[in-house]
């Protein structure tokens, strides 16, 4: 695995986590 791919994978993971948190906040009406 090249370092560049590792960084992309980590970025994807962070993005997914942020999207999940935003979705949960949106459903709860918390902004």
UniProtKB/Swiss-Prot annotation:
Phenotype upon gene inactivation: Cells lacking this gene lose the ability to utilize ethanol as the sole growth substrate.
Modification(s) after translation: The post-translational modifications that lead to mycofactocin involve oxidative decarboxylation of the C-terminal tyrosine residue catalyzed by MftC, introduction of a tyramine-valine cross-link, removal of the modified C-terminal dipeptide by MftE. The released dipeptide then undergoes oxidative deamination by MftD, glycosylation by MftF and methylation by an unknown enzyme.
Q: Which InterPro entries match?
A: MftA
Sites marked Cleavage:
29-30
Xref: Pfam families: MftA
Return the similarity comment.
Answer: Belongs to the mycofactocin precursor peptide family.
* Task performed by this protein: Precursor peptide that leads to mycofactocin (MFT) after extensive post-translational modifications by enzymes encoded by adjacent genes. Mycofactocin acts as a redox cofactor of nicotinamide-dependent oxidoreductases encoded in the same locus. Is required for the in vivo ethanol assimilation in M.smegmatis.
The entry's other comment says: Mycofactocin is classified as a ribosomally synthesized and post-translationally modified peptide (RiPP).
- This protein is called Mycofactocin precursor peptide
Q: Which organism is it from?
A: Mycolicibacterium smegmatis (strain ATCC 700084 / mc(2)155)
């Amino acid at each position: 695995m090249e370092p560049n791919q590792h960084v992309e994978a980590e970025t994807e993971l962070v993005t997914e986590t942020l999207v999940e948190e935003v979705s949960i906040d949106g459903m709860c009406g918390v902004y």
